[in-house]
């Protein structure tokens, strides 16, 4: 997603970019933020619009200050999260050490879902801890089932025990079964994990090598399987006409409202205001009211952004992320809504 000349030169992100990904029946709006601590403001903007987060940790460097800052942002915005340990294809990378560092910081909330298989120091596959099965890569992300090697059994049992404890804590019935020595089915484990990830009591750890596309499909499966439906997350502000709380909650049927979480000014792209639609369906040529600037804005064209590529769309639905071109008075942090609503998310934050 890095397209800026300076990003290409540095070989790292310096600003947030939107990368929509369609995976199965789901659309995932990925806000790819810089990992360097120098650009933490970009991550703050993205976190304010996100419904969940994936914290990327270098398998070589391990947990760093940026990792902890990203975790703190997730805590601030109450975001469900998972951790993706990258660079597993590199020599001398220890997934186990990264998991130990994370566990030392965040305790029993850390729960690995996968662990790597290595032969002669090379990353050749992984063990799915939920399914208790091994997979060997045969070509990039293509894989086949394989036996679990003896050298992996000790840590597999340790990581699996952590998962089973989390499953047991979701209900009295499961707790009784756990202490009775009963096994949980894969479906029961997955359902319990989704509940625990949603409320933040469990933070899954995945791993792979995006350069080789290894582990990417697993990550997308885990995002769709374990992160909560955004419509279940509260999204509210103040209706200034009534001075009452307006629960937007990403409802298509409610009056239109959206927040501006980032402004892009590019010599080639021009000025774009990136928006998260909180309720209703926003269409090009809508006239919306900016409560913060006390002015109306007539929308022109709407876009979804794929990195540096703007794609024009006729409308954006509640819960989606997109961009509006050439707003005049609107700034980052402002709220747009219909006149009948006069919705502001800022006012709600001050309650």
What is the predicted function of each stretch?
Residues 1-346:
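Structural and coupling elements of P-loop NTPases
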Residues 347-351:
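A short, hydrophobic C-terminal helix/tail in secreted or cell-surface proteins
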